[in-house]
Amino acid sequence: MAAAVASGIAPTTAMVDQVIPNQPTVAAAAPPPFPAVSQVAAVAAAAAAAEALQTHPNSSLYVGDLDPSVNESHLLDLFNQVAPVHNLRVCRDLTHRSLGYAYVNFANPEDASRAMESLNYAPIRDRPIRIMLSNRDPSTRLSGKGNVFIKNLDASIDNKALYETFSSFGTILSCKVAMDVVGRSKGYGFVQFEKEETAQAAIDKLNGMLLNDKQVFVGHFVRRQDRARSESGAVPSFTNVYVKNLPKEITDDELKKTFGKYGDISSAVVMKDQSGNSRSFGFVNFVSPEAAAVAVEKMNGISLGEDVLYVGRAQKKSDREEELRRKFEQERISRFEKLQGSNLYLKNLDDSVNDEKLKEMFSEYGNVTSCKVMMNSQGLSRGFGFVAYSNPEEALLAMKEMNGKMIGRKPLYVALAQRKEERQAHLQSLFTQIRSPGTMSPVPSPMSGFHHHPPGGPMSGPHHPMFIGHNGQGLVPSQPMGYGYQVQFMPGMRPGAGPPNFMMPFPLQRQTQPGPRVGFRRGANNMQQQFQQQQMLQQNASRFMGGAGNRRNGMEASAPQGIIPLPLNASANSHNAPQRSHKPTPLTISKLASDLALASPDKHPRMLGDHLYPLVEQQEPANAAKVTGMLLEMDQAEILHLLESPEALKAKVSEALDVLRRSADPAAVSSVDDQFALSSSE
């Protein structure tokens, strides 16, 4: 069951919902008559209030069950009739709507006791209020000590009648009958006594007796987690049994007689519709949990007449839904673990591929147990699907042979299927390792003269542009702080015989005469000084990445004072260097796929990065290098798909930025949130 009813605070609606019993039970047969409990006189109520005052000297009262229209002035007028009110407050939500309860503070505990004695259950706006001493100690409210659960209450039993019935046994800290949204009794309630002994005395005296001609059950309050089956597999403690598929002609007495051989029964009922006809299910409430467990074990699945009974623990709808969710999740995990290593994820599928064609393509590599191309609501392919094999070996063979294969007009991407949580965890772990200072040692590159230094090293800098000289001699590229992708992944290195002669602008004195290309100085201090102007680098980086443009005498007309850009190609003059377009066309993508197939694997990142970086820079200029490095960690076929599909690229860039925001400290990633907001709104 749920947490115990608050001792000083009345059970809220949420709390009441948590402690709803398994199923309401109805008395099947009236036991020997029991004298109805007489209503407690005002003297008894006064004595209980005085005893509470001696034990809990408190001048603050909790006032519950208020009509939503009741405000402070209504309560002030009422309580001032008994004693001067020090202050009061009606509790409200953020929209200033009443929560249905209030706190009233008096100058001394005697006034509070007198107000509780005189005004408890007094009507305001035709609704009786419920007054208790306020107790802010959570250990007392939530302990469940002295808490009694009463069910099978008659609809005429309200809070006042329940209080008067149980107050003769001792001091009551909290008393409430559960109500529905229209104010009708749900047939059960709670009473919390100050002492455990008085609670036990009330249980011994009233359990099984008649209240308004209905036999009631009175027992200790049991938390929901104690009723449900524990994770260790212990037998759940329950007494209420649900019986389904009952014959139409069976009566309450016959149902009780059928189950009575397994233990004492407090009530048994067959549920009926408005016409009085059986609904073919009912409930049997045993006195002991052991008898209920035996009845479930013995009676479930047996035949009664022409029907096979279902007998199980009675559950609320929320409990059944939770159990079904838990069972479904376990089955899903079990099914996924069974297919672990045998289930393939396919991406970049051609629109012409359907389930039959997909199975035909992959059947040559093994026994395909299932395959599916995912469709949208219009029945069109979403471009991805799944293929499951009977064993992991067949799946690995199919992945090896089919990954990157041209199907229709698209290169197919094939990988082992992963759950979303696993993919996100892998990406997070990968980026964390990349950013870890311990993994920032120099990374060897197939291109001579290129080294990757950790951040904070002699050649580190705050920006991503790199310096590449002729034959790469003695040059070290600058890397962004805390980011460790390999140098050959950087864009700007076009496919060809060797790396381009490329240099980002840096402050120098403008030359007055055309002369030879400006050389590089190898000193680390000079190189660091060249990176001090971030704005200057960002203004000119795109020009040098995108093409040489129109230049004269090795100098660009639009370059700021003191900035001398160099040609991108050592074999061509700067004034006639062709303008390059970085937006790949379908023909370029097809040709790139062919070039990749002919090139050695160590050249693939360089070739892909040359095409990918400009597209990423258009969407995320501030962190283009970081995002490009992350995207280049993906499979080659998927990168080709990103080059071809702007929507897919934008989604991946957003995903990479999300990882950056979660993993990088604010100093490591510049304006990630602002840039991401801009790119998402475009």
From Swiss-Prot:
Q: Which residues form the PABC domain?
A: 588-665
Keywords linked to the UniProt accession:
Cytoplasm, Nucleus, Phosphoprotein, Repeat, RNA-binding, Translation regulation
Kindly give the CDD domains that the UniProt entry links to this protein: RRM2_I_PABPs (cd12379), RRM3_I_PABPs (cd12380), RRM4_I_PABPs (cd12381)
Q: Which domain of life is it from?
A: Eukaryota
| Tissue-specificity statement | Expressed predominantly in immature flowers but also at lower levels in mature flowers and siliques. Detected in tapetum, pollen, ovules and developing seeds. Also detected in primary inflorescences and immature siliques.
Gene Ontology molecular function terms on file:
poly(A) binding
Q: Which residues form the RRM domain?
A: 59-136, 146-223, 239-316, 342-419
The compartments listed are: Cytoplasm; Nucleus
GO CC field = cytosol; mitochondrion; nucleus
Q: Name one Pfam family in it.
A: MLLE
UniProt keyword Cell inner membrane, yes or no = no
- Which GO terms of type biological process are on file? nuclear-transcribed mRNA poly(A) tail shortening; regulation of translation; translational initiation
Q: Which residues cross the membrane?
A: none
Belongs to which family?
A: Belongs to the polyadenylate-binding protein type-1 family.
The miscellaneous annotation reads:
A.thaliana contains 8 PABP genes.
Role noted for this protein:
Binds the poly(A) tail of mRNA. Appears to be an important mediator of the multiple roles of the poly(A) tail in mRNA biogenesis, stability and translation.
Name of the featured protein: Polyadenylate-binding protein 5
Q: What species is given as this protein's source?
A: Arabidopsis thaliana (Mouse-ear cress)
Gene designation per UniProt: PAB5
